[in-house]
Amino acid sequence: HEKLVFIDGEMKELQNYPPLIEANVLSIMVAHIAVKNNTTYNTDGMPATTSRRIVTDLLRDSLNFNGLIVTDALNMGGVRNVPEAEVLAVQAGCDIVLMPLDADKAYDRLLEKYTTDEQFKIEVDNSVKRIIRAKLALGLMNEE
């Protein structure tokens, strides 16, 4: 929790995910772990939370996960020194960002990006749809 840790090479832990996804797990939390020496999913020294290769290419596209993708706490050591980590996490494909160092600044950066970047706006709008679907599935909202 205090520093960025690395997976070196093959990601053996991935074998646990397909059965969970097939069982319709509603959400997956992405950890602040970097991947190195992996030609497909190398995160270039950045936490997986901020990596489109991990969040979108792997979880969404390769593993066909359609539920919510949530960051681990953004105030943790493995990611707290990454500038605009909350924006990078959303750009990577995360739907929900947890515990940024400064929630007000994070909100301002996310709002600025949302209002000035059409692709980012599309990502956020898709995340909102997934969040609403999850709430409906859990009976937390009416369909009205």
Predicted segments with their positions:
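Second-shell residues forming the walls of enzyme active-site clefts
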Residues: 1-123
